[in-house]
Amino acid sequence: GIEKIISRSMFDQMLKHRNNPASFG
């Protein structure tokens, strides 16, 4: 459902933030 899509997107953002914290935001 949509909840899973949102959760996936948040997880993706977290991974990107961990890999490249300077580009957060």
Swiss-Prot record:
KW Cell wall biogenesis/degradation (keyword) present: no
Recorded GO CC terms: extracellular region
EC class (word): hydrolase
Catalytic activity: Random endo-hydrolysis of N-acetyl-beta-D-glucosaminide (1->4)-beta-linkages in chitin and chitodextrins; Hydrolysis of (1->4)-beta-linkages between N-acetylmuramic acid and N-acetyl-D-glucosamine residues in a peptidoglycan and between N-acetyl-D-glucosamine residues in chitodextrins
GO BP terms: chitin catabolic process; polysaccharide catabolic process
Cell compartment(s), UniProt: Secreted, Extracellular space
Function (record text): Bifunctional enzyme with lysozyme/chitinase activity.
Protein name listed in UniProt: Bifunctional chitinase/lysozyme
Organism: Carica papaya
Top-level taxonomy: Eukaryota, Viridiplantae, Streptophyta, Embryophyta, Tracheophyta
